[in-house]
């Protein structure tokens, strides 16, 4: 699995979302897009970060595509009623692999992410998030990528979603 870096071309994909039909990265050419790779919606940390992403999306106006390793039914049930205005893709498993995660080099949690995950779990519990069904890879790292108008990766971040850091990055881009 190759880790993507800024300057690399974002791998294309065309996948069904659970809320907005087919999502094809190439159709976002001409617009900046944020690709977010989550774990699964049963994960309290992922629930907490997803709430932050909804708020972030509304505040920044950047196009968002959210990838998750939950089953389509679980993903649709979780986001129902949340007012999600971006596509949520329940990534299909093919021969035991999540191909789009592999294409973007999003693998297992590193040691730093595990420590962050425990800290964030405390915040998630305080926010009332509870663990649901296990789906996907339990050791999966989250990640996010900012892709420019020409399909080139501007930011490649493997780890927990950080809206403050991402907002600063987008502000610096202008």
Q: PLM ranges: what are they?
A:
Residues 24-53, 63:
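Short active-site neighborhood of thiol/selenol oxidoreductases, capturing the structured segment around
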Residues 168-174:
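Juxtadomain coupling helices with adjacent low-complexity linkers
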Residues 48-103:
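Structural microenvironment flanking redox-active thiols in thiol-disulfide oxidoreductases
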Residues 38, 68, 148:
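Short beta-strand/turn micro-motifs composed of small residues
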């Amino acid at each position: 699995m190759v880790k993507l870096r800024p300057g690399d071309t974002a791998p294309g994909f065309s996948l069904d979302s659970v809320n907005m039909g087919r999502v094809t990265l190439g159709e976002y050419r001409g617009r900046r897009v944020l690709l977010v790779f989550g774990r699964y919606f049963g994960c309290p940390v992922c629930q907490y970060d997803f709430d932050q992403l909804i708020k972030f999306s509304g505040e920044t106006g950047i196009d968002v595509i959210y990838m998750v390793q939950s089953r389509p039914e679980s993903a649709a049930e979780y986001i129902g009623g949340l007012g999600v205005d971006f596509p949520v893709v329940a990534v299909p498993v093919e021969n035991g692999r999540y191909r789009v995660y592999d294409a973007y080099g999003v693998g297992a949690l590193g040691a730093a992410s595990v420590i962050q995950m425990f800290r964030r779990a405390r915040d998630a519990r305080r926010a009332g998030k509870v663990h649901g069904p296990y789906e996907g890879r339990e050791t999966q790292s989250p990640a996010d990528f900012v892709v420019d108008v020409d399909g080139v990766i501007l930011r490649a971040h493997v780890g927990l979603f950080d809206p403050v850091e991402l907002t600063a990055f987008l502000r610096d881009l202008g």
